[in-house]
């Protein structure tokens, strides 16, 4: 799942999700049922017949997430998927992602330059240095998830401390390498 939604503009929401599961569901009816199930899981059931240009950015991103999850991956790679979204939509999408993560119990590799987003979403943060790319540090996030066992409290003192540590690691790795 990438920053740009990469949806086929000539396909409906349902058809975009169906596209990724053709091999798993050769029967078009079964493929359609599976696609509708995923569209429903991301909260877009009533928009299944809509086209991407009829959806908001957050809705388009949910379609992209449904399409990525429909084949049943064990690992979901997300490269700055919420970077282009406004703050409110980003917060909703983060919540949706956490709900999906809990429901499916899959590994999510989430790439972001937003430190707060990293601390909110991650159980473990890997800090990479540029040129050449290498692992600088691994930072386990031990801040409890309070709201429904999903969300972290941004105003908890530990949250600020982790942000400070993470910021320091980034400054150190950038200064040393570029």
Question: What annotation goes with each model-predicted range?
Answer:
Residues 3-8, 114:
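Catalytic "switch" loops of ABC-type ATPases
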């Amino acid at each position: 799942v990438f920053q740009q939604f990469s949806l086929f503009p000539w396909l409906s929401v349902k058809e975009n999700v169906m596209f990724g599961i053709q091999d798993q569901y050769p029967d078009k009816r079964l493929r359609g049922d599976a696609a509708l199930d995923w569209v429903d899981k991301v909260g877009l059931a009533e928009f299944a017949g809509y086209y991407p240009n009829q959806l908001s950015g957050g809705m388009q991103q949910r379609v992209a997430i449904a399409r990525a999850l429909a084949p049943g991956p064990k690992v979901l790679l997300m490269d700055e998927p919420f970077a282009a979204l406004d703050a409110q939509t980003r917060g909703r999408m983060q919540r949706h992602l956490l709900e999906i993560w809990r429901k499916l119990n899959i590994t999510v590799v989430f790439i972001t330059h937003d430190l707060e987003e990293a601390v909110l979403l991650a159980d473990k943060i890997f800090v990479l240095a540029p040129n050449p790319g290498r692992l600088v540090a691994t930072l386990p996030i031990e801040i409890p998830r309070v709201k429904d066992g999903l969300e972290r409290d941004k105003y908890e003192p530990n949250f600020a401390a982790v942000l400070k540590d993470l910021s320091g690691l980034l400054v150190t790795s950038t200064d040393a390498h570029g």
